[in-house]
């Protein structure tokens, strides 16, 4: 056992003997002092607990430091977690600035269940393209009603504050990923005090949260922090995750906020630290060339090997091929029309017509930004590729509402499905622990596509989040679950509870047991639909 593992084990043992007060379960003893949660009827909550020093001042653009302060009074863990400062796609109006820079907290939700003295733990990383989103946006009422596990929501730095990088040791980037990792360490060390089982931690996330889960898992010591991982509609190989071109964008950020005289990374970092955080985040709008496109102008990067506290120094593909990653059970998923999240905004009505009309004149300009190959090809190669994929999916059709479904399929394939297949293929060849996958096809009455398109008269199919928002309530649904969705919701929640506590990595959904892909010649894919589930084998994803 290495030093980090020993410290975690000793911390868990010590904290296990200092759990919540049996006379008052709202009071919990931590190394920092006592905190008080809230009784919500069917569950307890302990919100906005700091796990890191505030990433402000000199700590901006630095790896997070563990929270060191001691509480002389009882810490009131009753405040809804604040969103990390962001330029939020879903905030209406011109000013989309939301949140605060001091935001590195975890929030814990514990069911009341007299039959259990302890619970498995599901740690949750929210999505939002590494640019926006918040822990509070993913509701927990469905999960708490089932009463199967403790839920921990992680907040982490976003946008330029979390992911600006010059690609060298002065401003290496990936601060948001480093936040997540520190939060996981905090959970491992402290969750026993809340009645959680530190040996039964499952890490999950959706979209950028799912990609974050996969990236965390690519750390070789991940198994010391969690026993399993689940990536919903997002993984490390998606083209919008680990991007190139970050150095140019970091200096462009500097020019946008008055740091144009900075000629090297060190001086740029110093200047950016001196600027108001709101100014840095508001500058995100300068990187958007069409609505909220590209949806992830700042994202994870490859860091140089000499960077302090480096998180990711190799392409994820090479990490998986090396076998030197967290060899724990992993599941990944996609829905049949994930790309609706990216394409639906093109059906929004404007005074000059629907937005998709613009693509007829601007496809060669916009496609590299929609599909994230703007920094990987020459101008000629980008144009050739843009023409080819249009021909492959739309043929001679023009861009309009009649051809929209083909465009949405293009977005689904390139941004989600193809990379899900590639990641699963690598894990089945180089992984040692089980690797599972499912595809979901059961459209919601209202979801993220209807919100972005601002219309309900189009059948978008099963879009990004239609499965995940049955586990965690989200503002984009705005409708009650149908009876079939209530069954699916319970199946998903039970699936997570069982995965977190399983000793052999077995994964089940309802009556269907997932099949392991490791060592399999064909892809083992569980299809989940309105009235059941079925195991299917594929040479390529359907």
Swiss-Prot record:
Resulting phenotype, residue 394 to I: In strain: Lig74
Recite the lineage of the species: Eukaryota, Metazoa, Ecdysozoa, Arthropoda, Hexapoda
Instruction: Describe its partners and assembly state.
Output: Monomer.
| Disulfide bond annotation, renumbered to this chain | 84-103, 259-271, 512-533
What keywords are annotated for this sequence in UniProt?
A: Disulfide bond, Glycoprotein, Hydrolase, Secreted, Serine esterase, Signal
Annotated signal peptide: 1-19
Protein task = Transferred from the ejaculatory bulbs of males to the female genitals upon copulation, plays an important role in the reproductive biology.
Q: Which reaction is catalysed here? A: a carboxylic ester + H2O = an alcohol + a carboxylate + H(+)
Q: EC annotation?
A: 3.1.1.1
The reply on keyword Secreted is yes
Its EC top class is: hydrolase
Q: Tell where it localizes.
A: Secreted
KW Membrane (keyword) present:
no
> What SUPFAM superfamilies does the annotation carry?
alpha/beta-Hydrolases
- Lineage, top-rank taxon, reads Eukaryota
Listed GO molecular functions? carboxylesterase activity
Q: Which protein are we looking at?
A: Esterase 6
Q: So where's the catalytic machinery, residue-wise?
A: 207 (acyl-ester intermediate), 464 (charge relay system)
Q: Which organism is it from?
A: Drosophila mauritiana (Fruit fly)
Q: Where does the record say carbohydrate is attached?
A: 40, 418, 454
Name the major location. secreted
One Pfam family from the UniProt entry? COesterase
InterPro entries under this entry? AB_hydrolase_fold, CarbesteraseB, Carboxylesterase_B_AS, Carboxylesterase_B_CS
Impact of altering residue 355 to S? In strain: Lig74
User: What Gene Ontology cellular component terms go with this record?
Assistant: extracellular region
Task: Say which family it is in.
Answer: Belongs to the type-B carboxylesterase/lipase family.
């Amino acid at each position: 056992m290495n030093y980090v593992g020993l410290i975690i084990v000793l911390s868990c043992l010590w904290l296990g003997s200092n759990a919540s007060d049996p006379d008052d379960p709202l009071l919990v003893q931590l190394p920092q002092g006592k905190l008080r949660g809230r009784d919500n009827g069917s569950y307890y909550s302990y919100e906005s607990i700091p796990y890191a020093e505030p990433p402000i001042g000199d700590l901006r653009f630095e790896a997070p430091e563990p929270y060191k302060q001691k509480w002389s009074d009882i810490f009131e863990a009753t405040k809804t977690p604040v969103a990390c400062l962001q330029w939020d796609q879903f905030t209406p109006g011109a000013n989309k600035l939301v949140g605060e820079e001091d935001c590195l907290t975890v929030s814990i939700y514990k069911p009341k269940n007299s039959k259990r003295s302890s619970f498995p733990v599901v740690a949750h990383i929210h999505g939002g393209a590494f640019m926006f989103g918040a822990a509070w946006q993913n509701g927990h009422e469905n999960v708490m009603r089932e009463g199967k596990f403790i839920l921990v929501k992680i907040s982490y730095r976003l946008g330029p504050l979390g992911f600006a990088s010059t690609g060298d040791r002065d401003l290496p980037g990936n601060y948001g990923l480093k936040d997540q990792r520190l939060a996981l360490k905090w959970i491992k060390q402290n969750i026993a005090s809340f009645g959680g089982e530190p040996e039964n931690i499952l890490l999950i996330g959706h979209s950028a949260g799912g990609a974050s889960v996969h990236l965390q898992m690519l750390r070789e010591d991940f198994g010391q922090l969690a026993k399993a991982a689940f990536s919903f509609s997002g993984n490390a190989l998606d083209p919008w995750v680990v991007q190139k071109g970050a150095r140019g964008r970091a200096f462009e950020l500097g020019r946008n906020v008055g740091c144009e005289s900075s000629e090297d990374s060190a001086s740029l970092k110093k200047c950016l630290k001196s600027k108001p955080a709101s100014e840095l985040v508001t500058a995100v709008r300068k990187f958007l060339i069409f609505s909220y496109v590209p949806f992830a102008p700042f994202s994870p990067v490859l860091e140089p090997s000499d960077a302090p506290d480096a998180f990711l120094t190799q392409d994820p593909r090479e990490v998986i091929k090396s076998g030197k990653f967290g060899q724990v059970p992993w599941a990944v998923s996609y829905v049949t029309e994930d790309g609706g999240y990216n394409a639906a905004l093109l059906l929004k009505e404007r005074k000059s017509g629907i937005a998709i009309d613009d693509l007829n004149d601007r496809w060669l300009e916009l496609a590299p930004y929609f599909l994230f190959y703007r920094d990987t090809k020459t101008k000629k190669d980008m144009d050739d590729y843009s023409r080819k994929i249009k021909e492959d999916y739309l043929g001679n059709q023009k861009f309009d509402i009649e051809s929209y479904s083909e465009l949405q399929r293009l977005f689904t394939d390139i941004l989600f499905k193809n990379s899900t297949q590639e990641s699963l293929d690598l894990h089945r060849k180089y992984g040692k622990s089980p690797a599972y996958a499912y595809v979901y096809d059961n459209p919601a009455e209202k979801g993220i596509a209807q919100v972005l398109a601002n219309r309900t008269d189009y059948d978008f199919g099963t879009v990004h989040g239609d499965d995940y928002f049955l586990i965690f309530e989200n503002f984009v649904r705005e409708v009650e679950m149908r009876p079939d969705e209530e069954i699916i919701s319970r199946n998903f929640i039970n699936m997570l509870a069982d995965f977190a506590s399983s000793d052999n990595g077995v994964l089940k959904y309802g009556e269907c047991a997932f099949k392991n892909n490791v060592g399999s010649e064909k892809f083992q894919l569980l299809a989940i639909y309105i009235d059941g589930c079925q195991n299917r084998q594929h040479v390529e994803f359907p």
